[in-house]
Amino acid sequence: VKDKKVLICGDGGAAQAVKAVLQDEGCREMISMRRTKTADTITYEEACAKHHDCQIIVNTSPCGMYPNHLDRPIDLAAFPDCEAVVDLIYNPLQTRLCVQAKKRNIRCAGGLEMLVAQAKYAVEFFQQTKLADTIIDTIVTQLMSEKRNIVLIGMPSCGKTTIAQSLAKRLN
């Protein structure tokens, strides 16, 4: 994030934490966007018109969270210089914003890892114990494998059941 221009979608508590980290990491410029303009934020329309050169976009808003998972806070097509997207939402695992980023070959990170990291630090604090940082990746990997599924589509008698039975044996 050093020397990058960052667009932050949302202006609540999570946005304030993101701003503090970006400032510590040497972010060149931070733009805060929300639905309605305030003294400290701009609107979606202003972001697209005046700040299309943002290199990193961070979604701290609930836009795109289940049950409104078909929403996204911004259209990445308006930001041709975007290099990375961070979406703090963890449900769904892949928000529409992250899906769009991946289709555009833009690096993207979702919110599940952050949620697990928060839980790790909460356990350490309340249990007065120290856990290895590697537990974060272990838990994220386990959760991802539990939440993902395989969908087989095809005409009748094309082998979906046979493939499903074979997959079930290998995956269980």
Placement of each model-derived feature along the sequence:
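Glycine-rich adenosine-cofactor-binding loop
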Residues: 1-23, 154-156
